[in-house]
Structure formats: structure tokens, C-alpha cells
């Protein structure tokens, strides 16, 4: 493996292999990830990050395949990070039907990487956020982050993306109820994919009703999430979806909300890093504090006071 500085120089020159190697490093070596991000950070902050989320089987990869085409038609450099729940057997990402996107892999203007959540409680891993920064520094104009909308991931995608696209399909049972469990709150654009299926009009109607109930909220924000009907396999509605993504980007920039979002993102990231550092220090030092643990065991000290004492000693170092 080449030295990090050499890889970064190659990244600046548009070397795709260097990008792949840097992402592998941030995935597998936290100490190297720290060095890489420090060095490339001034080059970041230019890409528009679009989260594509929704339940399994919603056809996200098919849609994304078509969205890549739309972006490339405009000459944009595209990055794609496809996040999968970690395979319990290999620790790698489960590729599934994402193979169809690989036809773009010979296009020098498209970089696609599949990543696992890797034990971050089902959420987006720190490595995913670092990979986004690497693609940003590489010069991607738009970075799509595709996730399965389950567990913690759908919450994390809001902290990561500038624009969140929620993809649903007819036939999920109580469609809006299924989505409502946290997902309604996070979407900037709704997509009813596989709109040629029976029940698509009902899904569209239910989403419209649910959004209309939040009328005051949208008026305050200045953006009401549009609902786009698509058929990913034929490309129907994809151009309209791409236009709405661009429209939302323009809204964020002109309203000042993009700067707000990014500030919140940085705050969250710094807090996460601090929490990780403290957790590691506590884990490494806990054996030194056997006396404190014994005091809690003997009811001479409560767990909160014990935690305060341990943190005091660790932070004071």
C-alpha cells in the first residue's frame, strides 16, 4: 500500500484507484482514517449529498441507476455509496441487486462503492461518512448514498444528506403507517416507485393526505415535500425526480438552510467522535477503577457518581 500522501496526491489528479484505496483504508484502519480526513478536509464541502432510502424491495437501485444517467447527461461527476446491513458471515456489504449499477463502473465520471454498516448499531458507520468526504475531495458534484430504510440508518441519513429521497411502493399494507414510523419526518422528496402497480394511486393519495396535515410545518420551512410517481424499470418519472432534487438543492442554498444543515452535521459528527474517544478510553481504563466499581457493588456509591468520577479522571489526563 502506497503512503497516504502519495494516494492523496493521486486523488487530487483524479485517480480512481487512489480513491478506492483511500476508502479501503478508512474502512479498515481508524488511525489512518484520522490522518486521511485531516489532510483532505480542506477539499471537501462542494458535493451535493443525496440520501436515497426506503424499505427493502422498493426498487431504489433501479431508480438510482437511472438517476446516475440523468446526472451524467449534465456532465456531473457522480459518486455512489451503497450502504448495506453488514453480512453476519463475511462482515462485507450485501450487494443484492446493485450489480445492475455496475454498468456505470466503466464510466470515468462515476464512482460506485458498496459499504457495510459494520456494527454501528445498524446505523451509518463512521467509515461511510469518511468515504463521502473522500468522494467530495475527489471532485464529485453529487454523491448518492443509498440505504435500506430500517433501524437507525434512516435517522442517520438525515445527519449525512443535504436532500433525502424516500422511496416507497404500493402494497406495503398500511402504506403511510409503515412510512410514518420516523420516516415521514425526514424526507425532502417522496417517491412512489413501481407506480404501474395496482394500488399506486392509493399510496399517492395517502401520502398527499399525510403531508397536507402538516401544512403549517411546510409553510414555516418554505418547502413542501413533493410526491413523484416513478417506474424505475422504464425510467418513467425519473427526469422529474432529478429536477426536484436540483430544485431542493437550489432552495437549500437560497434559503440559507444548506449552511444550517451542514453546521448541524458538523456538530453531530464532532459529538460522535468525542463519544467514541471517551468510550475507548473508558474501556481501556476500566480495570484501573476496580475500587470505584467495588464501591458501587457495595452500595457506597451510585452508578452516576461512579461515572462522574471515572470521566473526571480520564478527561483530566
Swiss-Prot record:
It comes from the Archaea. GTP binds at residues 54-62, 196, 231-233. The keyword Oxidoreductase does not apply. GO terms for molecular function: ATP binding; ATP hydrolysis activity; GTP binding; GTPase activity. It holds the Pfam family MeaB. Its EC number is 3.6.-.-. Keywords: ATP-binding, Chaperone, GTP-binding, Hydrolase, Nucleotide-binding. The keyword ATP-binding applies. Belongs to the SIMIBI class G3E GTPase family. ArgK/MeaB subfamily. May have GTPase activity. May also bind and hydrolyze ATP. May function as chaperone. This is Putative GTPase PH0274.
Amino acid at each position: 500500500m502506497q503512503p497516504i500522501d502519495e494516494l492523496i496526491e493521486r486523488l487530487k489528479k483524479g485517480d480512481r484507484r487512489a480513491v478506492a484505496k483511500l476508502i479501503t483504508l478508512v474502512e479498515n484502519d481508524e488511525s489512518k482514517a484520522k490522518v486521511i480526513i485531516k489532510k483532505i478536509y480542506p477539499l471537501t464541502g462542494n458535493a451535493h449529498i443525496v440520501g436515497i432510502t426506503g424499505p427493502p424491495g422498493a426498487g431504489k437501485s433501479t431508480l438510482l441507476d437511472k438517476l446516475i444517467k440523468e446526472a451524467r447527461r449534465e456532465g456531473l461527476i457522480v459518486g455512489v455509496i451503497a450502504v448495506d446491513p453488514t453480512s453476519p458471515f463475511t462482515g462485507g456489504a450485501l450487494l443484492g441487486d446493485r450489480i445492475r449499477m455496475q454498468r456505470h463502473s466503466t464510466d470515468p465520471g462515476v464512482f460506485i462503492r458498496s459499504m457495510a454498516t459494520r456494527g454501528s448499531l445498524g446505523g451509518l458507520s463512521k467509515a461511510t461518512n469518511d468515504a463521502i468526504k473522500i468522494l467530495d475531495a475527489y471532485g464529485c458534484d453529487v454523491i448518492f448514498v443509498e440505504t435500506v430504510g430500517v433501524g437507525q440508518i434512516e435517522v442517520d441519513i438525515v445527519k449525512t444528506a443535504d436532500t433525502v429521497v424516500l422511496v416507497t411502493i404500493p402494497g406495503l399494507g398500511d402504506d403511510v403507517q409503515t412510512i410514518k414510523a420516523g420516516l415521514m419526518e425526514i424526507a425532502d422528496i417522496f417517491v412512489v416507485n413501481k407506480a404501474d402497480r395496482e394500488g399506486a394511486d392509493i399510496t399517492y393519495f395517502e401520502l398527499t393526505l399525510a403531508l397536507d396535515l402538516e401544512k403549517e410545518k411546510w409553510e414555516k420551512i418554505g418547502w413542501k415535500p413533493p410526491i413523484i410517481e416513478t417506474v424505475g424499470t422504464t425510467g418513467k418519472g425519473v427526469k422529474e425526480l432529478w429536477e426536484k432534487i436540483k430544485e431542493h438543492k437550489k432552495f437549500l442554498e437560497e434559503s440559507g438552510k444548506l449552511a444550517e444543515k451542514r453546521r448541524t452535521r458538523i456538530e453531530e459528527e464532532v459529538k460522535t467522535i468525542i463519544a467514541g474517544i471517551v468510550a475507548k478510553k473508558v474501556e481501556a481504563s476500566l480495570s484501573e477503577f476496580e475500587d470505584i466499581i467495588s464501591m458501587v457493588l457495595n452500595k457506597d456509591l451510585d452508578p452516576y457518581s461512579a461515572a462522574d468520577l471515572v470521566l473526571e479522571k480520564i478527561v483530566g489526563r
